[in-house]
Amino acid sequence: VPVYASWDDHDYFSNDRAGIPNGYTEEDRQGVRRVYTQSWNNPAYGFNDQRGGIFYRTRVGPCDVIVVDNRYFRSGQKGSFLGDGQMAWLKEQLQACSGPFIIMACSTMWSDYVSNGKDSWGRWDPEGREQIFKLIETQRIPGVLLISGDRHGARGFRIPRPGGFNLYEFESATLGGRKGLPGKRPEWKDVQLYGISDTYAFSEFSIDATLNNPEVSF
């Protein structure tokens, strides 16, 4: 079974760390990336040159899979969640995908429901997130499924857009069952698909691309 990986904060120095954390150097950052590339046999590792990163795009069956890197390029300034180069790359990849579904993964949550301004798009780069979501919406890029992690537990959310379009996020779970925030909250009732916390869990997409209108279940 092919395994495709990404890192999050505890793989990248420590809790909520990104870019070059205080007390570390560029050499340390390169070392973290080097160990990662030696540990995971991914299809690519970012720019594959001195610019670094570990993002990539691949294909699993009929589906495109895009994994972004929201740790390496952050500078501590708003708008640096992916960095300019990776953002341009992501926009190109989204428009080049040809499968019925695009699984787009980010190690932190796409929505703000659980993160509440913590180590998230909502805190560091809401403008960049809006660029991505608006591109998907205006270019009518079909079948985008958002997956995420970071916060302990497994939750699914509908992300409504101003024009009535919806994106769907699947926080993929905590295999180790570490307790985190509540799986459900009353204020999420209109947007939440499911919620699990304080137990073992994993997530799985089942895709049937043989139909005239391909289907996915989660």
Describe each PLM feature range.
Residues 1-218:
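Metal-dependent phosphoester/phosphodiester hydrolase catalytic core
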